[in-house]
């Protein structure tokens, strides 16, 4: 399951469960209908705390979704995870799509104030890897 929310700062995507290729295809379609260029850059919060790593065939669609976000103006993003495997996969996908410099990965299992940390990065560019 997934959810896309427009927020004051940009967009929030929430993933839950084990997402298959079809789930991500639906997500991509939803993104293309929901997310529009705002005429300026915007940040994205990706909440994957209740999700698991993507199967290989779904990863290509996820990369396409990342490229779409870049195309319509994504500036920074924060990815919140609970799984070491999902974190490794997210970092790899970030590198493969060229967003690794503007992505921050937050481990919600060790960071109780994960949302506060994520929003500090998204709204004010306070780097959680430095502070």
Model-derived regions: residue spans:
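Amphipathic, Lys/Arg-enriched alpha-helical "gate/interface" segment within cytosolic domains
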Residues: 1-131
